[in-house]
Amino acid sequence: MFDGSNLGRNTIAMVLAGGKGERLMPLTLRRAKPSVTFGGKYKIIDFVLSNLFNSGIRRMYILTQYRAYSLNKHIRESWGKWTGLGEFCVAISPETSSDSEQWFKGTADAILQYLRFVETADADYVAVFGGDHIYKMDVTQMIQFHRMNRADLTIASLEVPKEEASRFGVFSVDDDNRVTAFTEKPKDPETIPGRETCFASMGNYIFPTRKLIEVLLEGKKHYEDLDFGKHVIPMMLEKGDRIYAYNFNDNLVPGMKSEERGYWKDVGTLDSYYEANMDLIHVSPQLNLYNYKWPILTNQGNLPPAKTVFDEEGRRGVNIDSYVTGGCITSGSTVRRSILGPMCKINSYSLVEDSILFEGVTVGRHVKIKKAIIDKGVVIPDGAEIGCNHEDDIKNGYTITESGIVVVPRKDR
């Protein structure tokens, strides 16, 4: 784990975690997108928080909003124990804080509503990061770049294909990586000269504390729905402020192989979420969760080890090319190319293939599950088939994605 530095200690983080994640429905029906499970045991929010923590940035405010209960609970139970004297990881939301009586109207408005935490932080820098992406990053390298360029704002950037760029803030830079133009989610994105790709914002920013306070108070005078991409960045460019783009591909965390750098996933749709999870079960995935020098932290819980039972012809408990977390029991069944969240039980004579099972899923006997996402606590009855016949799946009320993934939601309680 990175030991931290003065840069980390002189920085506070404001993590934006209030998004609805509508394209992930029905997984976000009862939880915010950052609270969705990833990789069996983690929450999406754990990745940005681990990056900040491992970078030595251990004063973190997580700004939550939509269906915040489960996310706030996760922050409290999983992250409170990692902090030491003078450190904190606190979730705050309009419904739980007396400081704010209204919902966030924009990304910058979310910071503005809690500006007093920035003003009293005694920090040189503020890291404003999104809470709903999957990646590893040493944030202090970005802060060093920011300092070297004496920037008023540094934007973490990556190259994306032109056909995907309309989902991002897109910008142009000069030879020194200084931003010369910026457009939020353009219909016809400007490509990098000589390429079919665009420079896109990751939604991660480094500000000097005084500059952030200044631009937010100024922006408040003009925009009620103050947003970094729509308002703050264009406003700063117009004033001639020094805005620089930090190339995320240059970032290399301790223990990371060169071929692993540059991994960043939005997981904003059910198909992209499924694909990113399935990447983990490859022999050498680009996102290496076994890099103990840069761990992804979460609430481990007091779970027993996973186990397989029965070794009879036709009733053999096996997990093949799969990612199986604590407390799971594969009982006389086959799990192949799948991810099992904590405390799943797969009963005899069943097959789970190319699927993601959330925590506490119970699969009955003689069940077939193929290319599916099963939400938390779902009980699959004996003899059921999921992903084998989409007409039947639709009749059962399941969601079918464009690529044919079947999503089984939690039952109403």
Curated annotation (Swiss-Prot):
Documented EC number(s): 2.7.7.27
Catalysed transformations (reactions): alpha-D-glucose 1-phosphate + ATP + H(+) = ADP-alpha-D-glucose + diphosphate
Name the UniProt record assigns to this protein: Glucose-1-phosphate adenylyltransferase
Subunit structure: Homotetramer.
Annotated organism of origin: Trichlorobacter lovleyi (strain ATCC BAA-1151 / DSM 17278 / SZ) (Geobacter lovleyi)
GO biological process, one term: glycogen biosynthetic process
Metabolic or biological pathway: Glycan biosynthesis; glycogen biosynthesis
PANTHER family listed in its UniProt record: GLUCOSE-1-PHOSPHATE ADENYLYLTRANSFERASE, GLUCOSE-1-PHOSPHATE ADENYLYLTRANSFERASE-RELATED
Lineage, highest ranks first: Bacteria, Pseudomonadati, Thermodesulfobacteriota, Desulfuromonadia, Geobacterales
Pfam families, A to Z: Hexapep_GlmU, NTP_transferase
Function: Involved in the biosynthesis of ADP-glucose, a building block required for the elongation reactions to produce glycogen. Catalyzes the reaction between ATP and alpha-D-glucose 1-phosphate (G1P) to produce pyrophosphate and ADP-Glc.
